[in-house]
């Protein structure tokens, strides 16, 4: 029996953490509980918020306003560079780890807070109330083996968008059992999502809006380039019902030995390319829709990619226990990759359900991101 798309999104809507989390993670992060059923805390100041998230105790934290970190840690003026020129909409770059190389030197001033994310600890739930939960000028950092964390219905924005290396929204550097749901990321200096050089396992990123509309970019226009840099050894990511919009690259850069299951996600308005990466990255894309994407992936990608179609959908049974849903396209480049050698790597992982690509296109852009949790209440 074919399950309606909305029902797929809401299969576990009755399960909640302390009555503030809606739904439950599907895919690789199934079973995550975050802070559990303890009494929620409602921080009023930046200091209270950071203290709660960086504490060693389980916490359920509810955001009811914008927490503005811009200017709270001062600014830095130093030599940076102009890899793409100094035009009004061109990103400049911070010389992190000598990245600038021989590019033209320019003097830059950037905000320090955005470069140093909040180091969230294990057993945490962070949820925004309505559309009010915003982190401005500060991202979230998951490292050192932290686990069992839920982040739902928040927005992260204003991370030095004029400067490469200015700030990442979500950084994962050795984390496990993480669910990022109904979040919006925008105006980042660098990546919306980045995984580092330690394994990041059992992660589900779902119903998120990766908003690439920006003030400065590597293309000197309003399309953000640095979207998702996935380079961890053994990363496991379910990418479900997300909307990647108005970007030009690294959507994702699928490298390391990342295992990436993209299901019912939508890529739209991308004049550059979407998928790139190194030779050991592994990605299965099913039930996804590509709308106005000039290049979805290289014709001969370095990484291992499988794009589901009506012709090859049945071959997914060995990996997913079911046939795949075919991807859909409108005014986009070809995506004919059909590598199946990595399918055995799905063994033991929880697989997200999938609906059709056309249903994803109709539903996901209108219902992803902050302030749209009520979709499952009907």
UniProtKB/Swiss-Prot annotation:
Cellular localisation: Secreted
Gene Ontology biological-process entries: cell wall organization; pectin catabolic process
Domain of life: Eukaryota
Cross-referenced SUPFAM superfamilies: Pectin lyase-like (SSF51126)
Disulfide feature: 81-100, 90-220, 316-324
Gene Ontology molecular function, alphabetical: pectate lyase activity; pectin lyase activity
The protein's name in its UniProt record: Probable pectin lyase C
Higher taxonomy: Eukaryota, Fungi, Dikarya, Ascomycota, Pezizomycotina
């Amino acid at each position: 029996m074919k399950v309606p798309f909305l029902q797929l999104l809401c299969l576990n809507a009755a399960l909640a953490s302390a009555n503030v989390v809606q739904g439950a993670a599907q895919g690789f992060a199934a079973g995550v509980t975050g802070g559990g059923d303890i009494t929620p805390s409602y921080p009023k100041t930046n200091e209270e918020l950071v203290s709660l998230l960086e504490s060693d105790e389980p916490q359920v934290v509810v955001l009811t306003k914008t927490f503005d970190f811009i200017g709270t840690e001062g600014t830095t003026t130093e030599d940076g560079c102009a890899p793409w020129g100094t035009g009004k909409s061109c990103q400049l770059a911070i010389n992190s780890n000598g990245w600038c190389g021989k590019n033209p030197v320019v003097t830059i001033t950037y905000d320090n807070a955005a470069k140093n994310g909040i180091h969230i600890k294990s057993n945490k739930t962070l949820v925004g109330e309505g559309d009010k939960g915003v982190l401005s000028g500060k991202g979230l950092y998951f490292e050192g083996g932290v686990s069992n964390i839920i982040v739902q219905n928040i927005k992260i924005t204003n991370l030095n968008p004029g400067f490469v290396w200015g700030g990442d929204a979500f950084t994962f550097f050795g984390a496990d059992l993480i669910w990022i749901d109904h979040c919006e990321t925008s105006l980042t200096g660098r990546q919306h999502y980045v995984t580092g050089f330690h394994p990041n396992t059992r992660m589900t990123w779902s119903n998120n809006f990766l908003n690439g509309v920006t003030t400065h970019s590597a293309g000197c226009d309003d399309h953000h380039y640095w979207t998702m840099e996935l380079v961890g050894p053994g990363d496991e990511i379910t990418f479900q019902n997300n909307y990647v919009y108005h970007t030009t690259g690294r959507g994702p850069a699928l490298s390391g030995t990342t295992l990436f299951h993209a299901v019912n996600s939508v890529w739209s308005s991308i004049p550059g390319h979407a998928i790139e990466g190194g030779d050991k990255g592994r990605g299965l894309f099913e039930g996804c829709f590509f709308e106005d994407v000039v290049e979805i992936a290289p014709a001969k990608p370095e990484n291992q990619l499988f794009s589901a179609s009506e012709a090859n959908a049945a071959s997914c049974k060995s990996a997913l226990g079911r046939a795949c849903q075919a991807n859909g396209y409108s005014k986009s480049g070809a995506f004919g990759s059909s590598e199946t050698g990595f399918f055995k790597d799905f063994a033991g992982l929880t697989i997200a359900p999938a609906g059709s690509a056309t249903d994803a296109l109709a539903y996901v852009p209108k219902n992803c991101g902050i302030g749209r949790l009520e979709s499952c209440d009907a």
